[in-house]
């Protein structure tokens, strides 16, 4: 199970009586896999779990030898070892059998603890040996989908014949409700129907009358990204039914066969959109190239691209009303985004914005006069999305538009209401008075809905264009996104609803409430909230209807209970009432798991091919791997087994972060648990409290059930009963606490192990007390450092390089900046961002002083915030990703000394690998790290310490932390060799006012 007395849960061995009873911790601090020797005196074990068990050829810090520990003395021995991945140890007599990949393929090896002889037992060269166990003179293991039995004496092995008979009802084709699996959506040109992608099928849903249609009905292929033709008669979508994604065009009623169009390259495709004249379709691909396809000839060509891959795909191409222009977004080398307009007639692209503001989400006005977009002038620190430096700096956008033709005036020219006398009759005047001024006329013209649907001719005059970019007045800059055009003079844009809560202890906030969609209309010159609680939205081609979707919970606009919901509302009228326009969007499809498994397996293979950060697949023969592992696919009879197979195939690329997760696996309802935030020992058949955890100071997100003032429970008390049920061993306290989290629970406690004189105390258990234990571990370390250094060193723990790590660093580092040096502990660091901010602060030196007129006049340093003495960073094998990079930067910049063990070795980042149709995923890393000398580094290696220190089980069991203690000793040694030179007083006051010549 998990050891919780640390910053993160870690695997640990316990023993429990076979007949049931109280668990007892074994003395090894951490242990993941292993077996007790036949005589019960030793344990052979693997200490570390892995973030990716299927990763092949891994040689990072998590690889450790098999440890064989004497349970009495805690002395260790190990088989000969050098960086290999050794696992699954099991005993036969005095011989330990285990799996090792030391010869390039995971095979069975043995180590004789008496003769100290190491031997290779199997010699497979294709599939790795997987799980292993031993007993009754034989070793059994998994390989190539079979269970093998090997006779230890003869060395002969055979495949064990196993017949597993079952109906496997989950593998039978069946109808499923896939409404919760909506991945993309599109609104028909006049808003009569919505098209959605759900679980790889294309459905259309009526706004009011009619039935839902499934146009595709195929579990064996994935259909994605529907888009309506401008006349509403056809839908296009991408499908991999041929084995690679192609474009299909189908009648919207689904009654005729779809037209298949092969695309020039084998990639994944995004953002399809028909031109308003119906002659072309634009789309983007995996490599951020923008394509335009001629519908008649089926020929496609590249018309633009974004040269920088960032996690969020931001090209967002849109058509002009006359089908002659495409506006899209691209990154400059500054990493700022600009709006670009491509002319299909000339084949030339024109940059609309100058790159001094970050621009996004272009949208042509229906009048053809304006190009709307969002832009930010405080993008700065957000330009590098991976860096921690951009934390706590929100990018705020304003609403802008460019007047495309230099002959057009601004719609924001001054207006004035004036009496003009009796109005002369005018055709089409409709009795409406003029608004006065050229600006009012322009605004009214832009806002007026077209009556004859004449397509405007869009021309973009480059001369003076920058001076014709207008910031829309009266709209405060905020975190806007997702701009879309409506009828002429109308645009919509979304704003994230602020998150609430702490996000689980140190994060940037809890779950948000969706988005508010604002509507801006030129005729009113103002923006108003139009919808709230929105997850996504689309505006119809005529601008008069709006399709939106809410997430789980629905939000205020849903007017319904929990669960996703879709709505079609009028976009050009009053703000819709809550719940108006809700669609009857129950989507059901016939799912054939076998066919779906084949599609998902193929998609997993393609995703690695198309999205991996280097083109050579790390040297893997990738087509052969598809054949090799695909041979096992017919034997897969459960979605979890499919993940296992995909993970094994992906392991051939030998890269970190290639996680395989999720899918349509039956959900298991978790129990709510119940924990008291305390440690216990068994004494005279009772649970005796040996430690009560509190939430230390300033941790408002932690609750300690037994440390609440007024709760009369103390260390040394015995728990006699829980909710009136007497507790005695072998019964288990945690059985009685199961389901009590967040509920009033009555404990009967006493200072003696009897019920006589006991008292009743009402407490509220927590679901998980790991946070309390982690905080206790951190505070214990801080106090140890304070004690060992006699108050001269700070201790700062950094749990990850995400927001919690950023918060923890800022909290602890600057609160201790009166210390002369610092111990930075990043053990068990879970990664996140590139911790450039932390490294910059640690590297900081001061330049001088400003005097202080208070107290004893100790001067301020400039900069004032920092610790100016030695820094020592503690690392271990459980720190990775951003937790690999941070110590690498610390070492590279020569900030200080690294103490501990080599880190994980997983320095690639993930971004935009598409999910599977059933919600699962297999990640293809999108970027890797290499040094300035043009060599890849850290991935599959880790960062080695300057001083290698192991936390041996014997030392840890004795209450020591050798890595922490060695780090303190090193920092004190460096401090003694080079004391911090800091002024404690100011120099003599200057005499600049003294006259050079005395007054007469």
Regions found by a protein language model. Name each.
Residues 1-14, 18, 22-34, 41-67, ...:
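A flexible loop/linker signature enriched in serine peptidases of the S9 family
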Residues 696-706, 720, 725-920, 956-963, ...:
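Cleft-lining beta-strand/loop regions that shape enzyme active-site pockets
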Residues 119-133, 350-361, 473-476, 480-481, ...:
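Conserved blade-ending motifs and adjacent loop-strand segments that build the rim/top face
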Residues 39-41, 93-94, 136-137, 190-192, ...:
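Short coil/turn segments that connect the beta-strands within blades of beta-propeller domains
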Residues 165-182, 456-476:
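A short helix->beta-strand "capping" segment at the edge of beta-propeller domains
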Residues 671-729, 803, 880, 927-928:
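PDZ/PDZ-like domain segments forming the peptide/carboxylate-binding groove
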Residues 35, 90, 132-133, 186, ...:
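Conserved beta-strand position repeated across blades of beta-propeller domains
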Residues 634-688, 755-763, 768-780, 968, ...:
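Extended, small/polar residue-biased N-terminal targeting/export presequences
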């Amino acid at each position: 199970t998990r050891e919780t007395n640390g910053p993160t849960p870690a695997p640990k061995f316990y023993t429990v009586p076979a007949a049931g009873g109280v668990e007892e911790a074994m003395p090894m601090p951490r242990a993941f896999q292993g077996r007790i020797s036949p005589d019960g005196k030793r344990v052979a074990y693997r200490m570390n779990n892995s973030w990716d068990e299927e990763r092949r050829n891994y040689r990072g810090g998590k690889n450790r030898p098999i440890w064989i520990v004497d349970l009495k003395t805690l002395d260790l021995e190990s088989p000969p070892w050098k960086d290999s991945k050794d696992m699954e140890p099991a005993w036969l007599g005095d011989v330990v059998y285990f799996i090792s990949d030391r010869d390039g393929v995971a095979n069975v090896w043995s180590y004789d603890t008496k003769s100290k002889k190491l031997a290779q037992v199997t010699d497979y060269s294709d599939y790795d040996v997987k799980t292993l166990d031993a007993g009754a003179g034989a070793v059994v293991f998994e390989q190539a989908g079979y269970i093998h039995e090997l006779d230890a004496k003869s060395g002969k092995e055979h495949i064990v014949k196993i017949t597993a008979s079952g109906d496997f009802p989950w593998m039978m084709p069946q109808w499923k409700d896939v409404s919760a699996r909506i991945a993309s959506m599109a609104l028909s040109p006049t808003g009569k129907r919505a098209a959605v992608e759900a679980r790889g099928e294309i459905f259309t849903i009526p706004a009011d009358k009619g039935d839902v249609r499934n146009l595709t009905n195929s579990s064996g292929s994935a259909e994605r990204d529907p888009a309506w033709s401008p006349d509403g008669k056809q839908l296009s979508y991408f499908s991999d039914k041929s084995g690679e994604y192609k474009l299909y065009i189908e009648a919207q009623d689904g009654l005729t066969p779809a037209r298949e169009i092969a695309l020039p390259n084998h990639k994944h495709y995004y953002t399809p959109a028909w031109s308003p004249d119906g002659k072309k379709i634009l789309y983007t691909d995996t490599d951020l190239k923008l394509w335009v396809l001629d519908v008649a000839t089926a020929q496609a060509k590249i018309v633009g691209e974004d040269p920088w891959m960032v996690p969020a795909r931001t090209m967002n191409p849109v058509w002009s009303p006359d089908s002659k222009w495409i506006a899209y977004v691209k990154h400059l080398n500054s990493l700022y985004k600009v709006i670009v307009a491509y002319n299909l007639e000339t084949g030339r692209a024109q940059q609309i914005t100058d790159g001094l503001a970050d621009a996004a989400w272009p949208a042509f006005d229906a009048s053809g006069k304006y190009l709307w977009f969002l832009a930010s002038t405080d993008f700065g620190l957000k330009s590098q999305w991976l860096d921690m430096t951009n934390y706590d700096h929100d990018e705020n956008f304003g609403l802008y538009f460019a007047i495309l033709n230099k002959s057009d005036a601004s719609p924001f020219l001054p207006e004035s209401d004036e009496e003009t006398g009796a109005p002369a009759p005018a055709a089409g005047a409709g009795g409406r008075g003029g608004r006065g001024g050229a600006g009012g006329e322009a605004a009214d013209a832009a806002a007026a809905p077209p009556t004859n649907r004449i397509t405007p001719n869009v021309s973009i005059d480059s001369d003076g264009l920058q001076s014709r970019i207008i910031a829309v007045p009266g709209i405060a800059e905020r975190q806007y996104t997702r701009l879309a055009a409506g009828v002429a003079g109308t645009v919509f844009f979304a704003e994230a609803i602020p998150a609430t809560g702490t996000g689980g202890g140190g994060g940037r906030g809890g779950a948000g409430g969706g988005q508010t969609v604002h509507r801006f209309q030129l005729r009113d010159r103002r923006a108003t909230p139009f919808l709230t609680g929105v997850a996504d939205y689309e505006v119809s081609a005529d601008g008069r209807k709006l399709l939106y979707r809410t997430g789980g919970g629905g939000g205020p606009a849903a007017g319904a209970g929990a669960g996703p919901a879709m709505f079609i509302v009028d976009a050009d009228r009053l703000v819709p009432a809550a719940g108006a326009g809700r669609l009857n969007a129950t989507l059901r499809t016939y799912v054939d798991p076998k066919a779906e498994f084949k599609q998902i397996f193929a998609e997993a293979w393609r995703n690695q091919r198309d999205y991996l950060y280097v083109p050579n697949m790390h040297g893997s023969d990738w087509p052969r791997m598809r054949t090799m592992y695909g041979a096992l696919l017919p034997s897969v009879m459960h979605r979890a087994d499919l993940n296992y197979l995909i993970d094994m195939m992906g392991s051939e690329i030998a890269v970190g972060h290639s996680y395989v997760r999720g899918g349509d696996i039956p959900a298991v309802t978790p129990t709510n648990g119940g924990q008291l935030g305390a440690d216990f020992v068994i004494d005279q058949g009772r649970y005796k409290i040996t430690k009560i955890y509190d939430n230390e100071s300033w941790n408002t997100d932690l609750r300690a059930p037994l440390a609440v003032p007024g709760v009369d429970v103390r260390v040394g008390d015995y728990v006699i009963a829980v909710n009136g049920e007497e507790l005695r061993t072998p019964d288990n306290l945690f059985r009685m606490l199961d389901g009590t989290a967040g509920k009033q629970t009555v404990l009967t406690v006493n200072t003696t192990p009897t019920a006589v004189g006991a008292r009743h105390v009402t407490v509220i258990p927590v679901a998980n007390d790991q946070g309390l234990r982690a905080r206790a571990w951190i505070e214990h370390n801080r106090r140890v450092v304070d004690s060992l250094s006699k108050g001269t060193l700070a201790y700062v723990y950094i749990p990850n390089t995400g927001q919690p790590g950023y918060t923890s660093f800022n909290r602890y580092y600057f609160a201790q900046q009166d210390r002369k040096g610092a111990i930075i502990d990043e053990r068990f660091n879970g990664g996140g961002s590139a911790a450039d901010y932390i490294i910059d602060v640690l590297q900081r030196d001061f330049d001088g002083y400003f005097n202080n007129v208070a107290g004893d006049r100790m001067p301020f340093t400039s900069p004032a915030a920092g610790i100016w003495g030695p820094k020592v960073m503690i690392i271990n094998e459980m720190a990775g990703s951003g937790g690999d990079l941070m110590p690498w930067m610390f070492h590279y910049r020569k900030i200080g000394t690294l103490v501990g063990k080599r880190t994980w070795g997983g320095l690639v980042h993930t971004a935009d690998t598409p999910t599977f149709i059933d919600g699962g995923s297999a990640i293809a890393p999108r970027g890797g790290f290499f040094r300035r000398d043009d060599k890849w580094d850290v991935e599959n290696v880790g960062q080695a310490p300057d001083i290698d220190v192991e936390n041996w089980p014997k030392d840890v069991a004795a209450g020591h932390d050798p890595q922490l203690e060695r780090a303190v000793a090193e920092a004190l040694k460096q401090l003694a060799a080079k004391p911090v030179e800091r002024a404690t007083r100011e120099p003599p006051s200057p005499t600049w006012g003294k006259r050079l010549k005395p007054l007469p």
